[in-house]
């Protein structure tokens, strides 16, 4: 019975190809079966005169690859119906510059390779671009030959494959028909739940889910899949390559699953693996963990890697070890440790006489000074970058890194930004970086570049220039999705607040929050609430400020973040303390001050190295937090009836500028007199 109705669904979609726009459906059933022997499958496979027919059946016991089966369909169709250069085909489809090398290597050898590494701040952007690329190539191929795809047991698909289906649902193509078979009594993986729910919701809205037999929406008797039960080949070299391929295609959750399966075999089943493969495994797993933001796990894995370094050629492996460890420390915000690791990586690379490792260690040292461009808006001052490093970046083809350096390392002074109102070319390096970002198609970096200038202008009181770049941002990004429109609305609200037009601000912030909520962007929402809190404090609405700050703080805690892009965690606690005491809540003020101090202890008690003059990035010195902590402490003493201690506390911090960067417009005036 299931086979009959399932075949009927396939027939229906096959006959709709080219005639109707929305040709993606889901067929739910409750008793497992295989589609390999269905008569309709054999018939359509043997008759490809009109439509290219492809089917895939996922296993409950085998790890599904990234973008499976779409990658192989693209490669096969290109070879059969187009031929020639696959790179040229990618360019025609608008595939992102940084992804073409990965796709080319997979097309030619089945093994993915990428020279210029992914930056942590661009992970989500690159994942979206890769999904778009896969979908757009399928659409392009369907213009040459209409395409029918049947995927059985689709609930076992990787996150990247499910994201591709979601993109095709939202951007339908009449020449593509897809039937998704789902065994309703077997649950998919936890990492895919969010996007899976979005697919189901979209298909339900279009009445595109068929329930065969008794397969209604089941909540009981649903079986879960266990990673430990997944089969992998005992040829570990092949398994590690598969995990590496998945990682290079940016499906990090699925790559982590693959690595965990290998790890389980090694630790609990005493499987044998040669040392060379084991070293590679730990490095692939560590890179995957870094790009998932799991730095502690990555450091643990690099330590496992170090224990396997052979005496022969140890300098090469030690350079790789310290490079990876420095990367982890950099993204953790432990910049001094990161710098020491980068230096060790460089020293061992020199001993190994490996020019590539020398270059990577030098580049890491430069990135550390800018916190890896992760969770920052701008740098306090210009970062020195030698001409030699610039030349090496060009030589090695690290164009994305070079664009980041041009944008963030230079043109950070108020005077230069002020002059750009009349002539943007005065921002010489910034303009170079902007042009390079546009050339390689990195829309995220173009947006971030404009945001850097907006933030620099705003914090310097140059609100007209800030608005100029808000407009430029909107003009460039308006066709690139709601996420950027939401961020532009946030920028408008921020600058209106800086100009004292506080009553207009909430409209823009609320519109941004609504868009970001729909897009499921919790970190961005937290940043908007942080900005809302500043506006409330300026208006004297301290209870609303506390509420907004608590939303931001809960997001930080829930997502296990070290900070937001707009501020450190300590600053949120300091503002909570300040808003609490101004609203008369002494108990909460004291509690938040204690939390703030826990984050600031390393600043309060550190030994100042007066020989170091460079600034690493905009939040490293915690000046704002130190002032807010001191000011809130003084106000708490004043509230308790102390009349002289508050002034003593403030004099202790007289060298700290008042909210001198992104909140410089938030003026706190105290008019009390000493008793």
What is the predicted function of each stretch?
Residues 237, 276-280, 316, 320, ...:
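Residue register of alpha-helical TPR repeats
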Residues 243-255, 287-298, 329-338, 368-383, ...:
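Short coil/turn connectors between adjacent alpha-helices in alpha-solenoid helical repeat scaffolds
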Residues 260-270, 303-310, 343-354, 387-395, ...:
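Amphipathic alpha-helical segments of tetratricopeptide repeats
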Residues 147-151, 156-211:
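Sensor-1/coupling segment of RecA-like P-loop NTPase cores
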Residues 33-142:
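Conserved phosphate-binding/catalytic loops and adjacent sensor/switch elements of nucleotide-binding enzymes
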Residues 1-47:
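Walker A/P-loop-proximal flanking segment of P-loop NTPase domains
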Residues 230, 273, 313, 353, ...:
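Structural signature of alpha-solenoid helical repeat scaffolds
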Residues 199, 208-228, 232, 578, ...:
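C-terminal non-catalytic interaction modules
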